Every structure is written in C-alpha cells, then in structure tokens.
Amino acid sequence: MKEKLVAIVGPTAVGKTKTSVMLAKRLNGEVISGDSMQVYRGMDIGTAKITAEEMDGVPHHLIDIKDPSESFSVADFQDLATPLITEIHERGRLPFLVGGTGLYVNAVIHQFNLGDIRADEDYRHELEAFVNSYGVQALHDKLSKIDPKAAAAIHPNNYRRVIRALEIIKLTGKTVTEQARHEEETPSPYNLVMIGLTMERDVLYDRINRRVDQMVEEGLIDEAKKLYDRGIRDCQSVQAIGYKEMYDYLDGNVTLEEAIDTLKRNSRRYAKRQLTWFRNKANVTWFDMTDVDFDKKIMEIHNFIAGKLEEKSK
C-alpha cells in the first residue's frame, strides 16, 4: 500500500506555517519543511522560520540542519525527505510536506531524478564568470529565454540554482520543465493529497509588506550582519531574499530605506512566481485564505484531507 503524504504549498506569507500546525495536530501529523532556506542555522528572522512556541508540540524536520557556509541542493533535500516520510509512517503518524520551494516539493512528490545528472565543472565556471561580468539578473534572463517556467520558480539572487538549471539543459538537451513534466506524468509513489493556500493579491501583498517591517523590527539587520561578519558572501544561503538586500545595505550601496523597499518588492515578486509555479500543477486543490474564519477554514481543509485519504485507501 502506498504511504500517505499531505503536501501544503502556496506563496510566502499566505499562512502555511499556522495552517500546517493546526492540521497536523488534528491528524496526528509531523511536518517536513519544504523550504530551501530554513535548513540554515542562524537564519531565523529572514526566512520566517517557525519558532518552538509556534510548533505547539508538532515535530518539525529539515530545519536548522546546515551551516550557512554549506550548500544544499534539491537532490540533498530529496535524499533527506524521502526516508523521513517512511520513518513518520512507521511511527504511526501522517507526514506533512510544507513549503513554498516548488522544485523541492515536487522532487519528493514525484521522485525526480535530476540529482543523478552529473556536474559540468567547465560550464559551471563559465556561467560563474558570466555572473561576475554581467550580474545575476542577466544570468536569470538567459534561463528565462530557454525555460521560462523554471526561471519563474527561481529568484535571480539564487544564481547557483539558475546555473544548475542551465547545466541540466546543456547536459541533457532538455529543459528542467521538460524533465519535470516527464516525471510528473508518472503517478506519485505516494497516496498524495496536495493542498494549495491562496489569497487575494492586494491582501497578500499587504501581509508581505507588514511581515518585512516586522522582520526589521525583530532584528533582521543584525542577523544578516552576523553572516556578513563571518565572511559568508558567495554562499547559497545569503542569496536568499532578505539577506541579499541587507548585504547591499551593509556594503554601503543603498540606504536602509532602499534596502527595505527592495526586500518588499522582491518578496512580492517571489510570491507571484510561487503562485505561477503551483497553479500549473493539476493535482493541487486550492483554498482561499482571504478574510476567513480561520477555525472554520481549518475544519474545511481537515475534512477534505481526511475524505481524500479515506477515498484513496479503498
């Protein structure tokens, strides 16, 4: 019998964390974080990492497992998340895969084989030189022309993922989107229920802006400065939204006000890309979280998940 898996996806600031905890408590679940940046220790504020209090007793996995100086790929995530799903089942509990990093979530749900494609070091160095000469946006534009859907799922700051996508295209002759489409045509190895959370754009964007202000109040600048003072600069971790903008401020390239405004704009754009990515996935059932009675909405989603899992287990 297939192992059960609930995936909860959606844009930043839509409420995935709170929703997943409430559902996991009702369904005897454990949460596997599907966020590519919450794996890093010491990057709590900028990644909106869940606190111990917010976990409310629900076990969470794949958070704080890497130093910011280390890399972490979709293949690494798949290697860690896949056995965790089995382990959670063996404890008699229901695994929840929760996050906004679309490629990471899909790689587990459909067991992508992208990690098996070898590296092309010469081409990688060539692209790194291109970034040094022309910048991350120019590299992202290069991917956008070839594979716009993959580009939509990757922020330009995360140039290492952009390089990997271009590397895969060169090595296989297929875009990441084509590779993923082929994998997605194969049924998931899991008894899967996939939930998407959405919200009216104006409401979501207002939540994002307020979240950024809250991050700054809670110490985002000091958090970024600790990484900055460690000399962590070209690493994958600090290409994340929130840290790249603060580094520009710490370098003296922009004022703090400009950095905060850029962070808000980049976060809104990222949310738009996340929605584009997930809305192209046919197996997602969407729930609108705009101005809802939260407890009633949780019960609605709970009943949907329970019904789907029962239906699929027959």
Swiss-Prot record:
GO terms for biological process: tRNA modification. The record marks T101, R124 as: Interaction with substrate tRNA. Residues 35-38, 160-164, 239-244, 272-279 are annotated as: Interaction with substrate tRNA. Its EC number is 2.5.1.75. It holds the Pfam family IPPT. It is an enzyme of class 2 (transferase). InterPro entries: Dimethylallyltransferase (IPR039657), IPT (IPR018022), P-loop_NTPase (IPR027417). It catalyses: adenosine(37) in tRNA + dimethylallyl diphosphate = N(6)-dimethylallyladenosine(37) in tRNA + diphosphate. GO terms for molecular function: ATP binding; tRNA dimethylallyltransferase activity. Keywords: ATP-binding, Magnesium, Nucleotide-binding, Transferase, tRNA processing. ATP binds at G10, P11, T12, A13, V14, G15, K16, T17. It comes from the Bacteria. Its cofactor is Mg(2+). Substrate binds at T12, A13, V14, G15, K16, T17. Catalyzes the transfer of a dimethylallyl group onto the adenine at position 37 in tRNAs that read codons beginning with uridine, leading to the formation of N6-(dimethylallyl)adenosine (i(6)A). Belongs to the IPP transferase family. Monomer. This is tRNA dimethylallyltransferase. It comes from Halalkalibacterium halodurans (strain ATCC BAA-125 / DSM 18197 / FERM 7344 / JCM 9153 / C-125).
